[in-house]
Amino acid sequence: MNSVVTRAAIEPRPQAAAEEVVRLIDVKRRFGATPALDGISLNVNRGEILGIIGRSGAGKSTLIRCLNGLERADSGEIRIEGRDITGLQEQELQPLRGRIGMIFQHFNLLSAKTVEDNVALPLKIEGIAKAERLQRAHELLEVVGLADKAQAYPASLSGGQKQRVGIARALAARPALLLSDEATSALDPETTRSILALLRDINRKLGLTILLITHEMEVVRGIADRVAVIDAGRIVEEGQVWSVFANPQTDITRSLLGGIRPQLPDHILSRLSATTGSEVILSVDLAGPEAQGALFAELSAALPHSFRLVHGGIDHIQNQPVARFFIAVPAHEPALAGKVEQFLTARSARVEVLGYDTGHA
């Protein structure tokens, strides 16, 4: 049985059940003796953007291949718009795949076809009349900002432009679900931001449901409504993006967040001892109104001279303030660190004792 950390204690429950586009129930897939998916259960609601993040080899690619029917799950259910696809034959899967669009890391455009023809290709395969499919291609090129590139060939496009063509092609058949497999991994940061902004805009305007696979927390932060963390074929943590960023519950999530959350400076980290030192170093994670900074003024008033601020910062994710700070508490009074920790945790902060600073005078 999987141990999945959810955010029920800190996230309000919805007033009514949302319509599900995707539901996975205890999905398992093995390659020989190795479990690639080990009991995956999750859902994606209509109009939602769900980010699935994990390290290489965590099971992300297998999961997305099971969702579009390229891999068969060994057991469990994969429901797309209410229909379980796990037992469908290939001919039964074909119309269902028309409800699923896909964008890839390496674009997968046909070099001998124009941009217009690449976008129209799914409709050609469906047997749609030429005039209708070209009209649809022109509409989508307007959406992705490439109306002037209709007759260009992929070789003349930048990486970001190629991905925009890929997005337009994925939308050609008016899918209910868009799958994104590391779609920004080959792009520079500025282009990545523009592609994420485009996907968010499409999501809002069309109500398109998006499930994106990535190993980059910045991508999740930039676009997703919810995030699920996958490790060794299991969902180990999931919740709204802001709450996972503010209070990660598992080591793998904290590791994935390491590059974008404030970290204790190396020169202090190198001086930490588990047993003795002049100051106790605490990490303090906050979300919501308490993250705005007033909490430390209250702490200073309640316990004068009880701490100094070492490092940290405040961010805004999904319009929620999220903060992480590191504070140092004098170690000469053994009970003081406990009092500080108690004060902060009583006000919804997550506090962790990191150790003693042996180098601060």
Curated annotation (Swiss-Prot):
List the subcellular locations.
Cell inner membrane
Give yes or no: UniProt keyword Cell inner membrane. Answer: yes
Print the keywords alphabetically. Answer: Amino-acid transport, ATP-binding, Cell inner membrane, Cell membrane, Membrane, Nucleotide-binding, Plasmid, Translocase, Transport
- Give the membrane topology: Peripheral membrane protein
What does the record list as coiled-coil region(s)? none
What is catalyzed by this enzyme? L-methionine(out) + ATP + H2O = L-methionine(in) + ADP + phosphate + H(+); D-methionine(out) + ATP + H2O = D-methionine(in) + ADP + phosphate + H(+)
How is the subunit organization of this protein annotated in UniProt?
Answer: The complex is composed of two ATP-binding proteins (MetN), two transmembrane proteins (MetI) and a solute-binding protein (MetQ).
Name recorded for this polypeptide: Methionine import ATP-binding protein MetN
Q: From what organism does this protein derive?
A: Rhizobium etli (strain ATCC 51251 / DSM 11541 / JCM 21823 / NBRC 15573 / CFN 42)
